[in-house]
């Protein structure tokens, strides 16, 4: 039966996504020292509020680091660029108000739960809420209509379904941001062939913006990385974005330790 077969494929896909999410969740306990260091250094230099973070990752290291800034003496709020059901409930995630730091999760997030019934999105602050679907499904119900939610995770495959309204909203905000930006810094990103959506969005911005050309800087080295891997990666970036890409031999950790030193080398 075609219908049953199709449904089986859909269910299998959901299980694979949950399995991937569980694997990532188990890694969440790793140290996010350098995320905190980067945020602290940008804040110290008064650059944080002029910085927009775009993440292709599902983990919530950078999310939790930015969200942790919200306190009375430094009330910076995290803005994902989408509305959550939590906004309508007291003592829950608050609607961001200025001053804000924007974080766009273009492939979804471990702390997002989507309701296909009422088309709403719930955030589970500081927690990979997707795990509730495996560990305690009653805790994975929509805040608005009490139906069971599903993950928003776009798998790292060539075919990516970007039709979800919240995902498409995030992508629209990213493109708008890039059109107004002067510098795009890639950290820990290999410019994979599977990320064709990202490549062509950047190319579209690069070829149609009215401002001065967008500048690019890459930090994706690490101890023991092979020279041929570095060379192929640099060729991949420059083949698509042009020879003006500044491809450093530095790591994300080095950038996080002193971001201003690197940023100052760029004429903006």
Name each model feature, range by range:
Residues 1, 155-156, 251:
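Helix N-terminus capping/helix-initiation residues
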Residues 1-113, 117, 165-182, 193-205, ...:
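Active-site periphery "cap/insert" segments of enzyme catalytic domains
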Residues 21-25, 158-159, 188:
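Short, basic, glycine/proline-bearing loop/turn elements
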Residues 49-51, 142-145, 160-161, 165-268:
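SIR2/sirtuin-family catalytic core signature
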Residues 73-74, 122-126, 240-249:
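Short secondary-structure junctions
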Residues 79-80, 127-132, 209-212:
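Glycine-rich loops and low-complexity Gly/Arg-rich segments
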Residues 84-88, 133-139, 214-222:
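Short C-terminal domain-edge/linker segments immediately following a structured domain
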Residues 99-100, 105-165:
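Cys/His-rich short segments
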């Amino acid at each position: 039966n075609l219908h049953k077969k199709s449904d089986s494929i859909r269910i299998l896909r959901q299980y694979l996504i949950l399995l991937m999410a569980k694997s990532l969740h188990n890694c969440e306990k790793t140290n996010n020292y350098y995320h905190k260091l980067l945020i602290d250094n940008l804040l110290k230099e008064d650059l944080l509020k002029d910085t927009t973070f775009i993440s292709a990752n599902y983990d919530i290291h950078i999310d939790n680091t930015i969200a942790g800034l919200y306190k009375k003496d430094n009330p910076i709020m995290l803005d994902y660029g989408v509305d959550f059901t939590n906004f309508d409930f007291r003592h829950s995630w608050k609607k961001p108000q200025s001053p804000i730091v924007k974080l766009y999760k273009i492939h979804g997030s471990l702390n997002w739960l989507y309701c296909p019934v009422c088309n709403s999105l719930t955030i589970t602050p500081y927690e990979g809420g997707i795990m509730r679907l495996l560990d305690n499904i009653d805790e994975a119900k929509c805040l608005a209509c009490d139906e069971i939610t599903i993950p928003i995770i776009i798998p790292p495959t060539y075919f990516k379904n970007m039709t979800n309204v919240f995902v498409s909203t995030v992508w629209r905000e990213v493109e708008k941001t890039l059109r107004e930006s002067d510098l795009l810094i890639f950290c820990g990103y290999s410019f994979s062939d599977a990320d064709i959506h990202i490549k062509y969005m950047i190319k579209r911005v690069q070829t149609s913006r009215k401002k001065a050309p967008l500048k690019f800087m890459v930090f994706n080295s690490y101890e023991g990385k092979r020279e041929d891997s570095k060379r192929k990666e640099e060729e991949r970036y420059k083949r698509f974005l042009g020879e003006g890409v500044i491809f450093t031999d530095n790591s994300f950790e080095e950038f996080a330790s002193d971001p201003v030193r690197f940023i100052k080398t760029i004429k903006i």
